[in-house]
């Protein structure tokens, strides 16, 4: 899996793959265990996933990404809200992360993923995350 927002890991509800992607077809309907939280989530098929983009597997976090919200709604997944209104982790995350600022937590999550051997590559990329023009905070779909 690849992600531009590792801090949303605890809000993942499934992994989506394109049903035409031969690499992942045999995994549709199976489950994976998320690192750190050890929560099992299903692998689903959805044509939204671009086979050519990234790994071709998309972590779906409906409460914290607008495209993921659409996928989650389509497949009847309930969004898991992991941030409070101040951008701090709430009680839907492991205890050691609760009340941590989402941006500060990003570094801790990357560090923890590396410690347990679940980090393969770290690179800076440009991506779009919507910010409020008045609040200058990340806009979440929930």
Predicted regions mapped to residue ranges:
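NTP-handling and nucleic-acid-processing catalytic cores
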Residues: 1-86, 134
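Residue patterns forming the tRNA-binding/recognition surfaces of aminoacyl-tRNA synthetases
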Residues: 53, 57-142
